UniProtKB/Swiss-Prot annotation:
Membrane topology type: Peripheral membrane protein
Protein name: Ribose import ATP-binding protein RbsA
InterPro entries per UniProt: AAA+_ATPase, ABC_carbohydrate_import_ATPase, ABC_transporter-like_ATP-bd, ABC_transporter-like_CS, P-loop_NTPase
One Pfam family, short name: ABC_tran
Organism lineage string: Bacteria, Bacillati, Bacillota, Bacilli, Bacillales
Localization terms from the record: Cell membrane
Length: 493
């Protein structure tokens, strides 16, 4: 299938989202669509699949002018969109998820389960996926759920699959599996639109790249004819001199220490510390127990055994409220479900953990609150028309900045960052890194969990590696390599 989008314009209210965007997709190619958060990538694909209607512009499919009125119609014509938030019903079986709304029944209305299972198995075999059709989809890993979505798309005879941040929550093994599947689909003439911020993946799997900036097409080129620096420059409109801004660490005393901490079934006998002004990176494969550790240290989950020491004093943290009072902040990996109130304003999200600062006598001083929020919006360069904009309407990078702003506002001594730049574009990433460095200069201790090895290597002073719920090693940043980290993460020595 060949797709041509020409001079596409789209406005939401007063906000011009797309201004004359053009995009072309050839049969059997993997085409990267890149741009900073808010550049208009998802809006463009939503117009293609009929979720939104363009104000102006032309869409041609195989040379014929074509417009879809809704995503289901696009799917019926062979175009499937796999969103970053997967469309999976966790309490239903794998089979039920595959055939939801497309069940096969006899003339008497009896479900033909055997026939559906045969068709499902046929698709899974094509994808080399081994998965029980009777298990609940919620029991599957994110990588397996993604394969369910791909199989679902292929069962509608999809010729084009749009993938939005497909590897954001995948393990290294699942990413390799996804790339194998994409390569096989490509050989069968299926085209892939690959929306991602992960530059390494773009250069590994894609044939061409279209770069967008501020709702416009900047360039379309063959991957073989460009490089990392050129793509970044076109995305952000300027050169980023360094991917990871340099800093000279000034390390103080231990401000946070964990001794022999365990939570049954999650992690065991964990001990580590972080000093003021230090960034400790926590690396490991997905499922190793890193997030579970951070949740327990912040009081979200209860420790079974172990001790927590803050500024040299043994303390107990029974819940997040106690953690905040004792100077801890926690930026969760799941910003949409746990980090933000999506249908609440930016102002309310940022002010929420800081309400006591604006209400010394029980009444909120709205002037002080507004000044505080405006200061943080400017400081973190959160792109918004108003502090009253609901968090739901922000791009991924700006949502993450709101989460960071609300925790910076409490003035933490120790800040836990769990996947701080997941789903964030390269420009916003660098802004977050710069902010982390500024916080350490003020003496804040940072614990950073990340699945991106370049980020771990580029930002950490020390690196703790977790394997199957235990700390398998600790490396100073000067001695760390990707190979050494991966060896420890997979149980090697």
């Amino acid at each position: 299938m060949q797709i041509e989008m020409k001079d596409i314009h789209k406005t939401f209210g007063k906000n011009q989202v797309l201004s004359g965007v053009s995009f072309q997709l050839m049969p059997g190619e993997v085409h990267a669509l890149m741009g900073e958060n808010g550049a208009g990538k998802s809006t463009l694909m939503n117009i293609l699949t009929g979720l939104h209607k363009a104000d102006k512009g032309q869409i041609s499919i195989n040379g014929n002018e074509t417009y879809f009125s809704n995503p289901k119609e696009a799917e019926q014509h062979g175009i499937a969109f796999i969103h970053q938030e997967l469309n999976i019903w966790p309490e239903m079986t794998v089979l039920e998820n595959l055939f939801i709304g497309k069940e096969i029944s006899s003339k008497l209305g009896v479900l033909q389960t055997r026939k559906m299972k045969a068709l499902a198995k046929e698709q899974f075999d094509k994808l080399s996926v081994s998965l029980s059709l009777d298990q609940e989809a919620g029991e599957c890993s994110v990588g397996q759920q993604q394969m369910i979505e791909i199989a679902k798309a292929l069962m509608t005879n999809a010729e084009v699959i749009i993938m939005d941040e497909p590897t954001a929550a995948l393990t290294e093994r699942e990413i390799s599996k996804l790339f194998e599947v994409i390569t096989a689909l490509k050989k069968n003439g299926v085209s892939i639109v690959y929306i991602s911020h992960r530059m390494e993946e773009i250069f590994a799997i894609c044939d061409r790249i279209t770069i967008m900036r501020d709702g416009k097409t900047v360039d379309t080129t063959n991957i073989s004819e460009t490089d990392f620096d050129e793509v970044v420059k076109k995305m952000v409109g300027r050169e980023l001199t360094e991917r990871y801004p340099k800093r000279t660490p000034s390390l103080g005393d231990k401000v946070f220490e964990v001794k022999n901490a365990s939570v049954k079934g999650s992690f065991e006998d964990v001990s580590f510390y972080v000093r003021s002004g230090e960034i400790v990176g926590v690396s490991g494969l997905m499922g190793a127990g890193r997030t579970e550790m951070m949740r327990a240290l912040f009081g979200v989950d209860r420790l079974d055994t172990g001790e927590i020491w803050i500024a040299g004093k043994k303390t107990a943290i029974k819940n997040p409220q106690e953690a905040v009072k004792k100077g801890l902040g926690f930026i969760t990996e799941n910003r949409k479900d746990e980090g933000l109130l999506l249908d609440t304003s930016i102002r309310e999200n940022i002010a929420l953990p800081n309400l006591s600062s604006f209400s010394p006598k029980g009444l909120i001083d709205h002037k002080r609150e507004a000044e505080f929020v405006d200061l943080l919006i400017k400081r973190l360069t959160i792109k918004t028309a108003s502090p009253e904009t609901h968090a739901r309407h922000l791009s991924g990078g700006n949502q993450q900045k709101v989460v960071i702003a609300k925790w910076i506002g409490i003035g933490p001594k120790v800040l836990i960052l769990d996947e701080p730049t997941r789903g964030v574009d390269v420009g916003a990433k660098r802004e977050i890194y710069t902010l982390m460095n500024e916080l350490t200069e003020r003496g804040v201790a940072i614990i950073m969990v990340s699945s991106e090895l370049p980020e771990i290597l580029g930002m950490s002073d020390r690196i703790i590696v977790v394997h199957e719920g235990r700390i398998s090693g600790e490396i100073h940043a000067r001695e760390a390599t990707q190979e050494r980290i991966m060896t420890l993460a997979t149980g090697g020595r």
